[in-house]
Amino acid sequence: MKNGTKRNCIFIFLAVFTLISIIAVWPDSGKDHDVGFTSAELKFEEKTEKDSTADSSITTYTFLNEAEETTWAIDRGYAVMKQLKNAEGQEIEERYFDADGNPVKLYDSYYGVEYEYHDHEAIIRYLDSEGNTMPLATYSTIVRTLDDAGRAVDDYYYNLDMQPVQWTGCYGIHRDYDGNGWNNRITYLDRNGQPVLCSSGYAINEYKRDEEGNVTGEFYLDTQGNPTKSSVGE
C-alpha cells in the first residue's frame, strides 16, 4: 500500500512538473503594444481630394487604431502618407507624417519623394522636411528610363549638382524582363553604361521565378556573363 501511494505521489509530481514546464516555455500569444502597432493591426483609411485649379489630386492614407485615432505604424515608419497625383494619375510627390501631422524621416533617410515625367523617362528626387531636394548617402536624384509599358528599365544616380555618382560600386542599373513581365535580370553599370562589378562582387544578378512571380533562385555573373560568387555570401 505504501509503495502504491509512493508511486502515485511520484506520478502526480511528474505530471505537475511537466505541466509547469510547458507553461513556462509556451510562447506568449499576446502582442507587446508598448513598442507600437504594425500596419496589419491598424485600420487603413484612404481619402482623395481633387484640386480642379491645379488639375491634380491629393490622396491621404491614414493608419487608425480601434478608437479611430491616427496611429503610427511601426513597420511603415509613419502614421500618414500623402500622395499628389497629376491629371494622368501619375504620382508626382509623396510625403510622410506622424500622428500629429509633423513631417517624418522615412527609413532615417528622406522625408518625401518627387517624380518628374518626360517621354519614356522619370526623374526621382528625394526631399527634406521643407520639400527641397536632399542628398542621400551618395545620390539625391535618380534618372529612370521607362519602356512602352511604363516599367523601369535603367536607373542612373546623380548628386545635387546633377553629376553622375557611384552607389554600391556602380553608376546605374539595367533591368530585363521575362515573357510574363517579371524582372528576371539586373545588370550593374559603369559611367558609360557598360557592365561593372558592384560592391557585392558581381555584375549581373539573375532571378528564377515561379508561375506567381516569387523568386525561387538567384544567380550571380561577372561582366562577361560567367558564373561568379557574391562577396556577401548570398
Segments and roles (model prediction):
Residues 15-26:
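Hydrophobic alpha-helical membrane-insertion segments, chiefly the h-region
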Residues 2-15:
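N-terminal Sec-pathway targeting helices
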Residues 26-234:
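Buried hydrophobic residues that stabilize the cores of well-folded domains
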